[in-house]
From Swiss-Prot:
Predominant localisation class: cytoplasm
Protein's organism: Synechococcus sp. (strain CC9902)
Record function comment: Binds to DNA and alters its conformation. May be involved in regulation of gene expression, nucleoid organization and DNA protection.
Cellular compartment(s): Cytoplasm, Nucleoid
Assembly, per entry: Homodimer.
Keywords attached to this entry: Cytoplasm, DNA-binding
Origin: domain of life: Bacteria
Family per record: Belongs to the YbaB/EbfC family.
Lineage: Bacteria, Bacillati, Cyanobacteriota, Cyanophyceae, Synechococcales
Protein name: Nucleoid-associated protein Syncc9902_0023
Segments passing through the bilayer: none
Length: 113
């Protein structure tokens, strides 16, 4: 089979083993990210938004003084806090995904790798 540019059976077996390990690790990572609570705050700290590691909204907290400033101030502060939480959450997810896949050599001869 090697004459057709295909990997040998041992390489395929190893690739499948790695794929199964990645799948198991990805499931564990999904559960870990779901359990995280990542807080983002606006610049003056009067609005906070919490997201999971998978960017699912969890809760919002607005300082009572911010609420007294009116709807527009609340909207602006909440959006700023949401953006901060989203940036932190996506950075966390990206970092954990890189940890998950970083040490794996998935290139196989004859398979475009």
């Amino acid at each position: 089979m090697a004459g057709f540019g295909l990997p040998n059976f041992g390489q395929l077996t190893e690739a499948f083993r790695k794929a199964q390990q990645i799948q198991q690790d990805a499931q564990a990572l999904q559960e870990e990210l779901d359990g995280m609570e990542i807080e983002g705050k606006n610049s003056d700290g009067r609005a906070s938004v919490w997201l999971s590691g998978n960017q699912q909204p969890l809760r919002v907290r607005l300082d009572p003084a911010l609420v007294q400033d009116g709807a527009e101030a609340c909207e602006t502060a909440t959006l700023e806090a949401l953006q901060a939480a989203y940036e932190q959450s996506t950075a966390t997810m990206k970092g954990r995904m890189e940890e998950l896949t970083g040490g794996l050599n998935l290139n196989l001869p004859g398979m475009g790798g």
